Amino acid sequence: MTFLQQLRADARHYNYANGRRWYRHGGFWVGAVYRFGHRVGNAPLGPLRYPLLFLYVLAAIPIRAVLHVNLPRHTRIGPGFCMHHPQNIIFPGETDIGRDVTIYQEVTIGRGPTPGVPRLGDRVVVYAGAKILGGVTIGDDCEIGANVVITKSVPPRCVVSAAPVRAIPKDTIDRLRQGQALGRRSVAPEPLEWTH
């Protein structure tokens, strides 16, 4: 996928957020600077490479200094990346992030008790204040709730919430919602057993 195709996919993701156009979201521009640095750092540009990397560094300095967003150009991020309220967000350079991932403010994705760095699947949403630590995998279509600390892998299609933290399959939540719509009493679902 080309640089412009990735930016278009990101812009489409932002156009659905809050009814505002993509160019009015600060997170889009943070992502655009990352994508520029990633592309320049990995492309065989010959003598143009170093002046373009210098431009990337000039653009990245205010992002790190003012917004406190650490998004190294070595991070691998799929198209459709969206950061709402891009403040105090930290990624290690080796992180692998899937397609159509949404990140909110105060999120830390980094090293932890298990070796390695996290991997986020496709269509993952990470809400404000969440911490994903260590060599864990967050499956596709997961939602990580606000202020949750994750140190174990999460299977696909789960919602992880705080107090107490547990992973609930989205199918279970859908069935609960259907039952409530029909006027049935809901029963709390059993949490999944997590494995390393």
Give, region by region, the residue ranges found by the protein language model:
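Terminal amphipathic alpha-helical/low-complexity segments used for targeting or macromolecular assembly
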Residues: M1-L67, I173-H196
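Structural signal for interior beta-strand "rungs" in well-ordered beta-sheet cores
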Residues: A65-I168
